[in-house]
Every structure is written in structure tokens, then in C-alpha cells.
Amino acid sequence: FHVVLLPILIIAVVFFHILALHEIGSNNPDGIDVKKHTDQDGVPLDAKPFFPYDITHDFYALGVFLLIFCTVIFFFPEGGGYIIEYVNYEPANPLSTPAHIVPSWYYTPFYAMLRAIDFPLFGLTAKFLGFVVMAAGIAIFAALPWLDRSPVKSIKYKGIYSKVFLAGFVISFFVLAYLGSVPPTETKNMLAKVFTFLYFAYFLLMPFYTRIEKCKPVPERVGDSV
């Protein structure tokens, strides 16, 4: 199911992203509002046309992606067992079930969250709570524009709290990805609980630490930061 659904969602997101680029315009690495400085026709002085600049930029990214993609497809299709599990090369045996079934590599962090919730709470079963936590771990990214209360957009000018929490989030994500790809044990399950908490702490505490931290001043023009 997800093999079909995920590409469709990616295509839909790309479509809406292109619509937003034509309507609002693209951002810049410094998060500077280019609409503050315009010419007599109302065109931002620091803006550039979508074509050919953004198109050329996207073609470069596409070339890098295709290089990695083709390398994996033709020379490393199993991806160390993360892309295609080695058990898929074994003859099927209806009388035997694998002791550990690993989900697709991009689901392993959320699978670790699902397994970490092994206790009931407020009359809700552990299975239901695990599903809620797993779904929330994916959906919470959509709430970032409302959670981030920082006056600046670029991590380059944000305070130390944002950088520390971001580092903790990245570490938590990769640790959960590892824990979701290996058989569960009591120790690993406890680690999954800890890093699931740190994962959500990045988002749930964001309205507070982004509001109180001290940020660096943002330049008025894009070229001022060079």
C-alpha cells in the first residue's frame, strides 16, 4: 500500500510546491524578506526569475539524485538489507515466519516509536497509543510553521537553544532508525522510549525556546551576508 501511496504523495507535494513558488516566490538561505526592497515597478531588488535560475538549480539537484539513484539500483540494490531485505532472496516457506520483520528503511524511526509504546494509558490500549504516537511523529512536521515562534527563519541567525534542540532531534531520528531496524530487547525498548521523548520534545517545546532565545540580527539585503 505505502509503495503506491508514498510516490503519489510526493508528486502531490511537488505540485503544490511549484504552485507556491509561482504565487509567493522562493526563499533564500538567510530567510530575508526580499519584498522589503523593491524597484519602481514593485519587483524585489534581490529576487531572481524562476526561469532559468531555479530551473537550473533543480536540474543540478536532479542530476545528483539520479547519480545516487542509479548507483543504488544497478550496483547496490539491497542497500545492506535496508532497501531490500535479504530474506526476500530466500525461498518462501509457509510453515516458518521470520523472527524479525523490518519495515522499509524510511519507516524505521516511526516503527521504533510504535514498539516503544508498550503500556496502556488513560484506558487506551498500548497498540492504539503506539499507532497514535507513530502517526503523530509523521504528521507533526505539518505544524512547524505554527510551532516556530522565532523572529528569524534561518538557523544561521537563531539562538543556541534552537541549535541544541535541532542537534538532539537529528540524533534521536537516527538512533530511532537504528532501533527500528533491529530485533527489540528490553534495553533497546527503553532507549526507544527515551529518544521518542527527545524527538517530540524538539517540536512540543519549540514555541517556548524559540521565543526566549537570543537571535543574531538578520541583514536587510541578501548580499549583506556575503
Residue ranges: model-predicted function:
Residues 1-226:
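Membrane-embedded and interfacial regions of multi-pass energy-transducing membrane proteins
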